[in-house]
């Protein structure tokens, strides 16, 4: 049964969802701080260097930032769950299934991007940059890395979050197609420019060596093509269902919010 709900009720629910999310982030940050040394050890593994800090409170501030970053990073599934809980009453049955699939796919790709960065890009990037060291008696001068703990954390954070966001591309494309069906034709028409954008993005986010750039750009192109293939399947499904009176393209964005 559909009926209109006052806007204040929606605002109250949004406020409640935000509070739940903040509670989860705070709890995750607190737990992360209890295991700050173990988490930092995992971050240190790709570089395998000793670290220094040059400010009296730098190590403490770095631990605090680490806890906040981990709390935000691990709260992404909870963030999606809160969005799901708010939107689900206004969804049709097939939209519930589609949105559930998009959420699960988004979470999987979110952590997949981090794993690719940690296990593939980080070793390649650090090996490249460590190659600028000048060690040994046969060198004209000596250059040795003395990594600062805070700068290393910020660098890792930027890389991990950048990759996690980039890997949301399929979810973004499918969502845009749901809102604006002509997105598919536009993506097909602009495919060459999108590929060029992927290579530019890979050059910005990854080290300048070709291997690391291809490690980043190949998944982006693969996800892009898979997204287009999925859209094509959805279009065929819609064209099959429309003759029998079913309107699969109807959107909850144009409907009235309901209760279950």
From Swiss-Prot:
> Membrane-spanning residues where?
39-59, 68-88, 111-131, 159-179, 193-213, 214-234
Q: What topology does it adopt in the membrane?
A: Multi-pass membrane protein
InterPro entries the UniProt entry points to: Sec-indep_translocase_CS, TatC
Q: Which gene encodes it?
A: YMF16
Q: What is this protein called?
A: Uncharacterized tatC-like protein ymf16
Q: Give the molecular function GO annotations.
A: proton motive force dependent protein transmembrane transporter activity
Family membership: Belongs to the TatC family.
Q: GO CC terms for this protein?
A: mitochondrial membrane; TAT protein transport complex
Q: Where in the cell is it found?
A: Mitochondrion membrane
Q: Which UniProt keywords apply?
A: Membrane, Mitochondrion, Transmembrane, Transmembrane helix
Q: Chief localization class? A: mitochondrion
Q: Which HAMAP family match?
A: TatC
């Amino acid at each position: 049964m559909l009926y209109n709900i006052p806007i204040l009720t929606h605002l109250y629910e949004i406020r409640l969802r935000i509070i739940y999310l903040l509670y989860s982030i705070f709890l995750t940050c607190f737990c992360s701080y209890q295991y700050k040394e173990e988490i930092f050890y995992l971050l240190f593994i790709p570089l395998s260097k000793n670290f220094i800090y040059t400010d009296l409170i730098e190590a403490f501030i770095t631990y605090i930032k680490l806890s906040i970053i981990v709390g935000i990073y691990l709260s992404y599934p909870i963030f999606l769950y809160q969005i799901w809980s708010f939107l689900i009453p206004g969804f049709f049955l097939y939209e519930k299934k589609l949105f559930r699939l998009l959420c699960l796919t988004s979470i999987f790709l979110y952590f997949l991007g981090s794993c690719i960065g940690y296990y593939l890009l980080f070793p390649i990037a650090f090996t490249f940059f460590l190659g600028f060291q000048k060690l040994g008696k046969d060198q004209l001068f000596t250059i040795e890395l003395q990594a600062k703990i805070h700068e290393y954390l910020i660098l890792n954070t930027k890389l991990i979050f950048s990759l996690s966001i980039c890997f949301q591309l399929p979810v973004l494309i499918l969502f845009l197609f749901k809102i604006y069906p002509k997105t598919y034709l536009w993506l097909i028409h602009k495919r060459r420019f999108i590929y060029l954008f992927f290579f530019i993005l890979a050059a910005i986010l990854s080290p300048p060596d070709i291997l690391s750039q291809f490690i980043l750009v190949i998944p982006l192109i693969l996800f892009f093509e898979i997204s287009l293939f999925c859209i094509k399947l959805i279009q065929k499904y819609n064209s099959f269902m429309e003759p029998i009176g079913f309107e699969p393209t109807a959107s909850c964005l144009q409907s009235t919010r309901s209760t279950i």
